[in-house]
Amino acid sequence: MSNRPFTAKFPRYPENGDEVFIRGKLKDDAKSFSVNFCLPRPAQVAEHQTPPYIALHFKTIYDERDDTSRVVLNWKNLQWQQEEVLDNYWHVDRSQTFRVVFRLHEDCIKVFVNSVDHPPDYQFPVQLPLDQIESIELWDDVEHVEEISFRYDNGNC
């Protein structure tokens, strides 16, 4: 069973252009790491279970056999949908602190490594309502979370 070491609720529902910044450290022997952008969890779904509605599932999987890794992008509407598997070039050295920014748009979520002053490293279409995302969950082999910041686009205020 996966381990969910951290959950953070959005201070308000996100809007187009808002960002989530995460800085943390994986275990040196991490096998996987996931970030889920979750819609409200129905009362009958236990906290240790994966939520039924996930706008973005961003997972990095490390293969110990050949020292390769990959990124899996997916979403969930009761059932997991078709996943997209890409090369991992955002966080290869698990001994180093990671910094990742998720920029939320009505039609996609863009993923940036370290900062947003370059084209997105990954991008995934949003199939569930952006303004219903209420939390993010970090799963699997996280050693510690140093920071999660919610950055709101002032044009939306």
Give a label for each model feature.
Residues 1-75:
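Secretory/extracellular carbohydrate-interaction modules
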Residues 78-99:
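Short, aromatic/His-centered strand-loop micro-motif at the edge of beta-sheets
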Residues 22, 94, 98-121:
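Carbohydrate-binding surfaces in secreted/extracellular proteins
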Residues 22, 35, 58, 102, ...:
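Hydrophobic beta-strand residues in large extracellular and virion-surface proteins
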Residues 29-31, 42-45, 107-111, 118-121, ...:
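Eukaryotic short linear interaction motifs
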Residues 1-2, 9-17, 24-30, 128-157:
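Ligand-recognition surfaces built from glycine- and aromatic
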Residues 116-133:
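Short, solvent-exposed beta-strand-to-loop segments that form ligand-recognition rims
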Residues 14, 89-92, 101-103, 110, ...:
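Short amphipathic alpha-helical molecular recognition features
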